């Protein structure tokens, strides 16, 4: 993930053996504005958007903790937009590492691991 993914279509990108995400990206089933508008009838105020963002757990750190993302790719100081070349190198390095690992696995093992991965996603609060 780079930038923002905030829809069901964005979640379709997660149907993969590995999901990588830049450190300052966000990824969710809905935008924070949409969530706040539905839950609290206020998608415009910064307070409600912040509340929705916290509830949705959309940050790279949140998503790695909930096993939605497999690796968070660090960004250069100031963000990916500040140094495109450094960002591209970091993304390339991460992609090559994961592709190299995955291409060594047999298809039946890939399928089994993918299934196990999806079963681990999420959190339960009681």
Language model segments and positions:
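Intrinsically disordered, low-complexity segments enriched in small/flexible residues
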Residues: 85-126
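Conserved catalytic cores of soluble enzyme domains
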Residues: 1-92, 96, 104
């Amino acid at each position: 993930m780079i930038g923002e993914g905030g829809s069901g279509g964005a979640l379709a990108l997660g149907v993969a053996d590995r999901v990588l995400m830049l450190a300052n990206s966000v990824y969710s089933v809905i935008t924070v504005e949409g969530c706040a508008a539905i839950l609290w009838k206020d998608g415009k105020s910064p307070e409600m958007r912040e509340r929705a963002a916290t509830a949705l757990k959309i940050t790279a750190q949140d998503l790695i903790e909930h096993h939605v993302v497999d690796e968070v790719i660090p960004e250069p100081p100031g963000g990916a937009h500040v140094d495109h070349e450094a960002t591209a190198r970091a993304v390339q390095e991460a992609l090559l590492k994961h592709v190299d690992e995955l291409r060594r696995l047999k298809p039946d093992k890939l399928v089994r691991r993918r299934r196990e991965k999806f079963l681990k996603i999420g959190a339960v609060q009681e």
